[in-house]
Amino acid sequence: GVSGCGSGSTRPARSTCFLPLYGHDVQEANDDTIPDDVAEKILRFARGAVAAGWMKNKAYVNIGAVTMGIAGSFCDAGILQKYFGIRAEWVDEVEILRRISIGIYDHDEYEKALAWVRENCKEGFDKNLGKNLPPVITKSKIVPADKDWEFIVKMTLIIRDILYGNPRLDEMGWHEEALGRNAVVGGFQGQRQWTDWLPNADFTEAIMASTFDWNGPKAPTPFATENDTCNGIAMMLGSLVSGSAPCFHDVRTYWSPEACERVTGQKPDGVAANGFIHLINSGATALDGSGACVDAEGNHVMKPFWEMTDADIKACLNATDWCRADYEYFRGGGYSSHFRCKAEMPVTMLRFNIVEGIGPVLQIAEGWTADLPDEIHNTIDKRTDPTWPTTWFCPRLTGQGAFTDVYSVMANWGCQPWCDRLWPCGC
């Protein structure tokens, strides 16, 4: 940057005349070090610049259309183009069935991925056992339960290929399919035209958003449940500036200390002393959200993908089991990425909204995940769907406005009770 800019001091605190990068202390003219506070500002700007450059001219790939009339699933192509420089593309879900039927996927990688899943993705409990399900449900599951993983792994490979392309397909003679859609973010409709008879995309969504798969560490793919475009954009923004996994959650319930004590017999304490918000998506969240990774000091963290180690990957896999989907609302079956975030770590909650007459609005709430006592967790968890991934969130409060208390944070959250994102806290 250019020093001086009209300032009369020898080495002014401002380090550039183009950006507001003010250092805290005036330096000597011959001091060529970059102060820590200025370095952090430069890095923040650089991360934002890289994110903006990376998304430009790429695409949001809608696989399917609007899910159950959800407002966030209405893809506004104009907003995407004008504000983010990305295109909107649509691919019908039937394309997945075409590629499975004809075999348009890397068969060698399929065998590798399936073997990895069988070795590392342990199955959880099956809540369908013992139920007397009506014919409308039993007749709807056309993929046999013992073939679910095979179908799901193929679907995952195919969706990834649709988004990014795959040169292996070109070698197989499928040139157009090998090109992909130049995606930077995407989403899958699923409900209900797909999930009423085929395995859901919970595994696909969870593993794509994670910082690893059967090939080892990888950049996470922002990939929205129910093709919730607004949440997909929030996932994209958070991942591009942090390099970490976007965790898709529904903002389900605010639990006051009083309500918690009445229902569970215990009052929360620690970071949850003022109450907490139950974050739980309908079966799919990046495995990084388990909080199983640890840094050099032993703190539980969500790491950028380039810092993920074999030990981190194993820890996330061990913290997660895969429960069969409830056939009463996922008739086609599937597997949910079930975990309980037992870490207490700083995170950022993020929501992208589109407000009529105003335009795009971004909501941000910093806070912590909470590790609640078993007596509290088990009681509340069973009130929803215990096969889904659960996180307890405690926002950082200011005593004013939307951050007056925990209830205010949830009450002011856009389009709730739908979704939010979690990332490592800060910029």
Identify what each model region corresponds to.
Residues 1-427:
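An N-terminal assembly and electron-transfer interface module characteristic of large anaerobic redox
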